[in-house]
Amino acid sequence: MARLFGTDGVRGVANTELTGELAFRLGRAGAYVLTKETKHAPRILVAMDTRISGDMLESALVSGICSVGAHAVVAGVIPTPAVAYLVRKYRLDAGVMISASHNPVEYNGIKFFNNQGYKLSDALEDEIENIIMSHPEILPSPTGIGLGTKEYAEDALDDYIAFLTRTTTEKFDGIKVALDCANGAAYKAAPIAMLDLGASLCIIHNEPDGTNINDKCGSTHMDDLKEMVVQNGADIGFAFDGDADRCLAVDEKGNLIDGDKILAICGLDMKERGALAKDTIVGTVMSNLGLTMMGKEKDIHILQTSVGDRYVLERMLADGYNIGGEQSGHVIFLDHNTTGDGTLTAIQLLSVLKRSGKKASELAGIMQTMPQVLVNARVNNAKKNSYMEDDVVRRGIAELEEKFAQDGRVLIRTSGTEPLVRVMIEGTDIKKMDAEARKLAALIEERLQ
């Protein structure tokens, strides 16, 4: 049986895979596991992004939480990183975010945070899953005054915005910023925070209707933002994903500034200010080789973890580093928050822009990007993690690695949230890379149906 939890909580098509019944069971088991050591009636923050399925899942989740005697503190639509922050600020026992991040509207997800604002370890997720699948009878079913209640965190959005504005000493007067809010959870927080810090704004995709989240917008569809930056003469642009835990940027010329370049820009600025812990940036195996080359030039250590912001965070916590992230735009500023935070990332990058007096394109020039090609193979979800067990696929990967051994690298990995095997090639000949990546992806699709 496939594991219920993926790399970022439980995720699936709402109402068929992620049903109200499953949300109820997750609420019960999650509340129990995360609060069973507390000596008081536990309180758990619940928030969501703008998907139409959010109301259904919130109702079921809250019911599950209350049914084991915990209290649900409902915050409504706020970004995922707001949950991480507010759990700590309000001294709550846990937090839950209902979101499928960058996925299309038909998907939704549920991810938990502990009382310190961190995503759960594999061990805790396994404990929750084991109770749901095998031992639901151990869960309490109190009656009368033992039941939990629901309350509303009416100041949640304002408190999160106030936190964001305190993460910089800079004022952004005179800076024109373009925002693409992905019709998602950032649609209020990001514009208000930027305006409070003095920036002038032009905004797109900030009118969510429940169905338009991530729809040809946000950090996975950057064309609208690039066009708006150039047409409006903006100094920089930022795009968020559906739950606003990631951010990508666009310079004044309309060129992409991805997560690797954001790490390079902000990491170097931190080093120059004496604020970069152990002169180290934590990336992943998907980080562009250009980031490593920048690190060597600027005397900054670049470490690599497995793909996934949870693994970046684990390394940061284990060894005392304070900045890390992924090419996709998950950037963790551990001095400020315990998870990737898109609006916080935008504010930190704007702060560097303000301090330096440079244009965004000039800042991005500190890192030269090595060409990468990424092709997704859509496969049977039950087979995606066993691709190396297929002899034909294994030989195909070995042959590809041999072709690029001298002037590039090949990385094959599975998606933690979708039925995909990703083929990434880094090198110098883009035409050759693209052809070879597509060839291998087609082979993987054929073999893993």
Give the ranges of each region predicted by the language model.
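Gly/Ser/Thr-enriched, mixed-charge loops and adjacent short helices
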Residues: 13, 108-232
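N-terminal small/polar loop signature for handling phosphorylated ligands or for N-terminal nucleophile
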Residues: 32, 36, 40-107, 192-250, ...
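Short beta-strand-to-turn element immediately C-terminal to the catalytic PLP-Schiff-base lysine
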Residues: 112-115, 248-252, 332-334
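Gly/Ser/Thr-rich active-site loops/lids in small-molecule metabolic enzymes
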Residues: 121, 203, 255-274, 342-351, ...
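Proline/glycine-rich low-complexity loops and linkers
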Residues: 126-161, 166, 252-325, 332-333
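Phosphate-binding and adjacent anionic-ligand microenvironments
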Residues: 236, 273-449
